[in-house]
Amino acid sequence: MVKLRPKQCGRKQRTYRIVAIESQSRQEGKVIKEVEFYNPRREETQLDILAITTLCGSGVKLTETVCNIFRRATFKIT
């Protein structure tokens, strides 16, 4: 099963990329598609709405963390 989940980037100042990844693979595993960038320090979110809708239409599940990020986001469409 494929899920949208956060992938950590950076060591000291954490940022996250929301990626479509196989649920059985490890956190830093092979990414199928990258759909979002999230910076919790600046509350900055950049989304690719078209990619998210096509992935969700094809059966990709959202993790609870990603759902919370979507709810809090001030959307910048890329």
UniProtKB/Swiss-Prot annotation:
Transmembrane segments: none
Any one of the GO BP annotations: translation
Subcellular location, record wording: Plastid, Chloroplast
GO molecular function: structural constituent of ribosome
GO cellular component terms given for this protein: chloroplast; ribonucleoprotein complex; ribosome
UniProt keyword annotation of Ribonucleoprotein present: yes
Major place of residence: plastid
SUPFAM superfamilies: Ribosomal protein S16 (SSF54565)
Key words of the record: Chloroplast, Plastid, Ribonucleoprotein, Ribosomal protein
Pfam families: Ribosomal_S16
Family per similarity comment: Belongs to the bacterial ribosomal protein bS16 family.
Entry protein name: Small ribosomal subunit protein bS16c
Taxon lineage: Eukaryota, Viridiplantae, Streptophyta, Embryophyta, Tracheophyta
